[in-house]
Amino acid sequence: EVPVIIRNMDQDTAVRAMVDSNLQRPNILPSEKAFAYRMKMEAMNHQGTSGGISAKDIGKNANDSARQVYRYIRLTYLMNDLLNAVDRDVIGLQVGVELSYLTVPEQEMVEEVHESTGKYPSLEQAKKIRQHREEKTLILL
């Protein structure tokens, strides 16, 4: 037998409770943390409580700064292949964040280059790719 506490709560409160519980796990993948933070932020926005609770408050329980919470949330915009590379620590978190600003076709281009060369961009290269994208000078081959 396992002791159980049953609580009556709405969907958004249940999401927040589930996310808080999952973030306490000792070994959590970057993608899991990313989606947990995003779900919690969305639940709080839906409840209209985001004004009182910030990204800083969300990250506090997991010892992450507000800036780090936003970085993790950015990872949720990566296509699966790139996100899996972050989870496997083949791509660093910050490189993943930079690549998350690219469109899906642009991210696919990065993955195609990886498949042909076996390499992902460095942080400096990822920043340059993002800069070209924002300046609309990135050309897809």
Question: Where do the language-model regions lie?
Answer:
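Amphipathic, charge-rich alpha-helical segments that serve as recognition/docking helices
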Residues: V2-L78, N84, S100-Y101
